[in-house]
Every structure is written in C-alpha cells, then in structure tokens.
Amino acid sequence: MSKQILVLPGDGIGPEIMAEAVKVLQLANEKYQLGFVLGYDELGGAAVDKYGVPLADETLERARRRCHPARRRRRSEMGRHRPGHPPGARPAENPFATGPVRQPAPGVLYPQLAEASTLRPEVVAGLDILIVRELTGGIYFGAPRESRLLANGERMAYDTLPYSESEIRRIAKVGFDMARVRGKKLCSVDKANVLASSQLWRAVVEEVAKDYPDVVLSHMYVDNAAMQLVRAPKQFDVIVTDNMFGDILSDEASMLTGSIGMLPSASLDADNKGMYEPCHGSRRPDIAGKGIANPLATILSVSMMLRYSFGQVEAANAIEQAVSKVLDQGLRTGDIWSEGCRKVGTAEMGDAVVAALATL
C-alpha cells in the first residue's frame, strides 16, 4: 500500500525551501524504496489567493482523505501575517490533527556550525536537546478571552491559561518516553511559583514520573530555564513544557544551533501522525523570492517525518548524514555563513544535499 504525503508549500519563503526538501524526499523515496506518493495543495497566504481563506475545507478534507491510512502531512509557511487574512482568524497549530498534538523540536548543533552560534563554541559543542511542547491547550486556546472597553474609557484585555489533568498527563508521558530512549533525563518547565495551572502541571508530572523510575526528573521555572539555555544548555536532554513556554523556549534554542534555519519540528498526535515544518514558520518574508533562504531545517523536517511517522530510521539517518557532509564541504547559506566558507543559495544548498545523499 502506498504512503500518502500532502505537501503544502505555503507562501513567503515556503515554496523555495519546500522545493529543496521535496528533492531530498524524492531521492530518499527512490533510494530506499519507501513507496511514497506526493500530493500538493495550498496553505496560508497562497490559500487566501486561491480559496479566499488560509486553510480551505477542501484542503483539510483532502489531507484526511488522501492521507488515509497514513495521514502524514508536510507543510511550510502558514502566512500568519498575510495581508487580507480574515480579521480575527487565528490559525490552529495543527489543523489536520485527529487528536491531541505535541511538538518535538530537536536542538542539535552540528559541529561545523559551532562558530555560527552566538555562544562560545565550548558552551554549545556537542549540544543535543529535545523540546517537547504541548500544542493544543494552554493560553493560546483558552477561554474566556476578551478585549473590551471599561466604563472609564480605558481598554482592557485578558486571556485564560487552562490545563486539565489528562492534557498534562498525556504530554508528560510523551516527554518521559522520549527521555527514556535518549539520555534518561527529563526537565519539566513551568511557573509553579505563581500560576495555578503550573502547580497542577508539576503535580501531574510527578505522578507520571512514578511509572518511569529509570528517568531522572527535574523541575525548572521557565524564567530560569530561559537563562540556563544560554548559560549551560548541555545540562538539558529532554524538556517538556506547555504551549506558550515551549513556543518561546524553542525559538530561543534555535539560536543555539547557529540559526533558526537549522531547526526542524513536528506536530504529532498520539499515533505519530504528523505535520512537519521548519521552526521558523512564515518568517523572513523580506527575502522571499530571492533564493537565499536556508532550506536545511525543512530538509531535516523530512528526516523527522521518516523517523517519527514512518519508522524509516535508515533513510532518516542518511538525510542527516548528507546535511553534515554538505556542511563539511564548507557550503553555507547567509544565515550560517562564516569566514572561510562558501556562501550558496537555497537551490544550490538543496542540490548539494541531494548529491551527498546519493553517495551514501
């Protein structure tokens, strides 16, 4: 049975970087006889142009229908700031999900890019951390939320940060499961000194920990975690945290890798059905169409897809090795360039990864 993948390039730099990821995926598909069949549709600003909305019902239905039974998706740019986006519309983090979603974002520093990190090489050398972010609850989706005008004419707004025990337990188990197959260390990040939701978070994580005696659990307040990520990031192996904290910390961690252009991510449900994308989302519209965006995070998202959703570890490892080989050759896009390296564009970087993969 063929495995269906829906490719959603989106807008901004999306079509450029997605084209390179598809090149790599197509070679891996042929080389390892993976049996993938690719389909294409629009998302974000490109969907606004075609359908009048950022995510059309027919696109969502196509994802559900075409991708059955595997239902694997890849997307790139959501176009969150696209002019003409319907007022008040908020894009779901994973509108294709069939259940609760978590987002693992691996922060791996390739040794060739130690100089590209803003931290000293000895601080980040050998860095390999994983941030597991709860993706469907918390303050981004909590209710009630309101902006209103007070009687005295002053504007006031508020949001709500709710978490249920089951939501916390589910994401905690994911964090422990991933820590168990890595370095057996899990750091749960919260703000339990002031937030009731974080106090429940910490209590439930402690309960789940009883089922994982082989994993060392620690807790850290989010403000301290943000500081520790730049002071001593190698103390972390797996971090599990809520939606907003994970959103912030994963962006911070991206700079430890040299550039946010190096950081892939996945939005996965309980069955590892997923939507894969670079962490940078729809950023850098200023360079869209110039052919200079870094495609490596998107290419590494392909590797994540093969590993997590399809269990194709050999192919996933090969793509990561191909990226490392290209970096060994001194090829760099502008965001990771340093003296002594050769600056290349989006397509040339993608072609180089394809060539390296072909030799493995």
Swiss-Prot record:
One BP term from GO: L-leucine biosynthetic process
Annotated binding of Mg(2+), by residue: D223, D247, D251
SUPFAM superfamilies named among the record's database cross-references: Isocitrate/Isopropylmalate dehydrogenase-like (SSF53659)
EC number: 1.1.1.85
Residues at the site labelled Important for catalysis: Y140, K191
Subcellular location: Cytoplasm
Keyword Amino-acid biosynthesis: yes
Catalysed reactions listed for this entry: (2R,3S)-3-isopropylmalate + NAD(+) = 4-methyl-2-oxopentanoate + CO2 + NADH
GO cellular component: cytosol
Binding site for substrate: R133, D223
Enzyme class: oxidoreductase
Cofactor remark: Binds 1 Mg(2+) or Mn(2+) ion per subunit.
InterPro entries: IsoCit/isopropylmalate_DH_CS, IsoPropMal-DH-like_dom, Isopropylmalate_DH
Family: Belongs to the isocitrate and isopropylmalate dehydrogenases family. LeuB type 1 subfamily.
Quaternary state and interactors: Homodimer.
Name of the protein described by the UniProt record: 3-isopropylmalate dehydrogenase
Gene that specifies this protein: leuB
